[in-house]
Amino acid sequence: MQEIILPDNIKPALEWVNNRILQKVSPERKHGLAQSRFCGALDDWAVANGAGTAVPEWRFQVQPPGEIRRTLVPDVAFLSYERMPQSEQERIALPTIAPDAVVEVLSRDDGSRDVEEKIRVYLAAGTNVVFVVDPDERTVRVCDSDGQSVLGEEDDVAHRSLPGLRFPVRTLFASPPQRSL
């Protein structure tokens, strides 16, 4: 077997992790907030630098060397124009390369084995960095080929593969201010 093909018309999306099908879970508020904030920061950086595309829930077919091609749907993905030109990104609905950067936001239904397997697969398939956001602990784990580190609320999100991207971890978890109407 060389490829696992999953239906792409099912919502929430399906992924192939640890030799089984997993259906993504609709996020709770804190998950959705962290996901949208991270995607917004990454997209603002990508647009300002003409660097590529940052999209939530973008389906990819990834294949680490010597393994089967499988579907993964990161909470946020960034794909550079360097690795896939803009015209190709606009034309292809399902990229068959790993994203440059991935954000996975933990939810209560995520199994740690499954999260670790996704990190392994992304990095083995060519992803430069995987950010694992934990809304309960209010941390961001940064995983790359050199290992991993954990950022707290007082730290900034940044990575050498995304030059110029920098924002405070705490912004991922802060509620918007309430205004009187």
Question: Where in the sequence are the language-model features?
Answer:
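Gly/Pro/Ser/Thr-rich low-complexity, intrinsically disordered segments predominantly at protein N-termini
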Residues: 1-181
